[in-house]
């Protein structure tokens, strides 16, 4: 067996054991493991990253993490995943593709990245990969997203990932821009 084939085989075995959702040029998106809990807790504790979303207590974050691990057993193809830098395995953030909290009939994309990755194109790369995964791999008809009205950077990411404005959504008392992307327009 050549060295190339051996490396390819080992990489595929590694990816399957890590429950990889998607891989891009710079990112590895995978299911979280029990050892990743501190990563999510630290992300949720950073006030700079929760400026546009509801802040969680540490106990709430621990419950979200526990529920996330439990939900993987459902094998729906959806969930909350860790985002890791492919070059050095640095934790970039989290993303979610799951039933929306504001409309249980919709599947929503969400993401939160560490500050050092803002402005690098990582969010767009991530959003495009997850939209492609949702529409092409698990066969969703459409995916929605909401942003805080002042979060113009996230709105730009959504446009670059193929989303279009689709009215407003009301969530936790906030009136939010609502976006959708469908298989027919992606």
Region locations from a protein language model:
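Acyl-donor (CoA/ACP) binding surface of acyl/acetyltransferases
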Residues: 3-51, 80, 84-186
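Conserved GNAT-fold acetyl-CoA-binding loop/helix
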Residues: 48-68
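Short, conserved alpha-helical segments within structured domains
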Residues: 56-60, 79, 150
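A short helix-loop-beta-strand connector motif used in the catalytic cores of GNAT acetyltransferases and
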Residues: 69-82
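A generic local structural motif
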Residues: 15-16, 67-69
């Amino acid at each position: 067996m050549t060295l190339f084939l051996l490396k390819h085989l080992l990489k595929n075995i590694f990816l399957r054991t890590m429950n990889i959702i998607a891989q891009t040029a710079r990112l590895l998106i995978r299911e979280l493991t029990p050892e990743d809990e501190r990563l999510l807790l630290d992300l949720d504790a950073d006030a700079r990253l929760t400026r546009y979303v509801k802040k969680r207590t540490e106990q709430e974050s621990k419950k979200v993490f526990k529920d996330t691990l439990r939900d993987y057993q459902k094998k729906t193809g959806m969930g909350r995943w860790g985002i890791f830098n492919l070059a050095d395995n640095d934790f970039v953030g989290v993303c979610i593709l799951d039933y929306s909290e504001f409309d249980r009939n919709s599947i929503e994309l969400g993401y939160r990245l560490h500050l050092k990755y803002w402005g690098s194109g990582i969010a767009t790369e991530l959003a495009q990969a997850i939209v492609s995964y949702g529409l092409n791999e698990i066969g969703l008809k459409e995916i929605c997203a909401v942003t805080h009205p002042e979060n113009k950077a996230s709105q730009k990411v959504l446009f670059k990932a193929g989303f279009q404005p689709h009215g407003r959504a009301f969530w936790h008392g906030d009136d939010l821009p609502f976006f959708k992307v469908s298989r027919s327009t992606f």
